[in-house]
């Protein structure tokens, strides 16, 4: 089981029925296929259990996990530039004239197509967890763009996907700032030793504190000067550590050893059973964390 490292959280904006059996058929229409000789990139669905299963979904207790794979061809700009310049020089020498800009632009496409079959590929996988009980979708990635790209693939697969980023009633940065200023956090949480503070002004400064007591005069000075906390490292129930950001994304998830070892009694050779047990454990813990965090930050914005 690949334990999630990050969470970009989205709310289903209206009630839709997402059933694993139906989704399995829909995902099969867009399974991942490798890039052809002239493809720059390809994206599609693969089994969340990797080579251990052909199933494109895995479900338990109303939780569904799916996995998108992307292949991108790597063509460094200097390589393209060098090949293009060589081609331009040869043509200009052969024809005894300078090429026009439109001709050079056309040549660039030719050069790209000639280089593509020899380009290296970069592969990436993005896990997505659908909580049908609470109407949430979580994407295991650190960037909003990557999350939106993965959601776009799912939207294309299903035909529609009404989701919006999870939004809270109160500005997150103001709540986080008050937690650091007062040293008092929501029940079940504990301040760790890392934060980022930003000035409210457009071109204001940024302070990144690491391995530092956040409830200190030094940090208080920055808050008094008008900076707000935009990232904050927290511990939840001594079970999960993470960084909460002002866009409600959760980064650098770290599960305690006791939690990760909870299913050690299951034979590792039985991959499917261990995957299922870890998936149930992880989603149960993260669903509880998200609920506690949303409540602690003042509740979800009314839709």
UniProtKB/Swiss-Prot annotation:
A Pfam family of this chain: RdgC
Keywords: Cytoplasm, DNA recombination
Entry superkingdom: Bacteria
GO biological process: DNA recombination; regulation of DNA recombination
Cytoplasm keyword on record: yes
Single GO molecular function: double-stranded DNA binding
Family of the protein in this entry: Belongs to the RdgC family.
Described purpose of this protein according to its UniProt entry: May be involved in recombination.
Name of the protein: Recombination-associated protein RdgC
Origin species: Klebsiella pneumoniae subsp. pneumoniae (strain ATCC 700721 / MGH 78578)
């Amino acid at each position: 089981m690949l334990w999630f490292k990050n969470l970009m959280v989205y709310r289903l904006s209206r009630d839709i029925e997402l059933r694993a059996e139906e989704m399995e058929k829909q995902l099969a229409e867009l399974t991942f296929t490798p890039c052809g000789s002239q493809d720059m990139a390809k994206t599609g669905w693969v089994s969340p259990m990797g080579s251990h299963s052909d199933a494109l979904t895995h479900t338990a207790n109303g939780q569904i996990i799916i996995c998108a794979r992307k292949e991108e061809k790597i063509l460094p700009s200097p390589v393209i530039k060098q090949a293009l310049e060589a081609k331009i020089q040869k043509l200009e020498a052969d024809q005894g004239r300078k090429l026009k800009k439109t001709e050079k632009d056309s040549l660039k496409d030719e050069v790209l197509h000639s280089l593509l079959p020899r380009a290296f590929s970069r592969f990436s996988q993005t896990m997505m967890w659908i909580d049908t009980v609470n109407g949430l979708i979580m994407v295991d990635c650190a960037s909003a763009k990557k999350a939106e790209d993965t959601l776009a693939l799912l939207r294309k697969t299903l035909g529609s996907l009404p989701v919006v980023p999870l939004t809270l009633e109160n500005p997150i940065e103001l709540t986080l700032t008050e937690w650091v200023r007062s040293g008092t956090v929501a029940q079940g949480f504990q301040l760790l030793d890392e934060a980022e503070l930003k000035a409210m002004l457009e071109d204001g400064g940024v302070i990144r504190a690491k391995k530092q007591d956040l409830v200190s005069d030094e940090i208080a000075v920055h808050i008094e000067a008008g900076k707000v906390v935009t990232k904050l490292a927290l511990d939840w129930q001594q079970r999960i550590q993470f960084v909460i950001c002002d866009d409600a994304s959760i980064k650098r998830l770290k599960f305690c050893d006791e939690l990760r070892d909870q299913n050690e009694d299951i034979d590792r050779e039985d991959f499917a059973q261990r995957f299922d047990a870890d998936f149930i454990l992880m989603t149960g813990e993260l669903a509880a964390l998200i609920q506690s965090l949303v409540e602690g930050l003042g509740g979800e914005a009314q839709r």
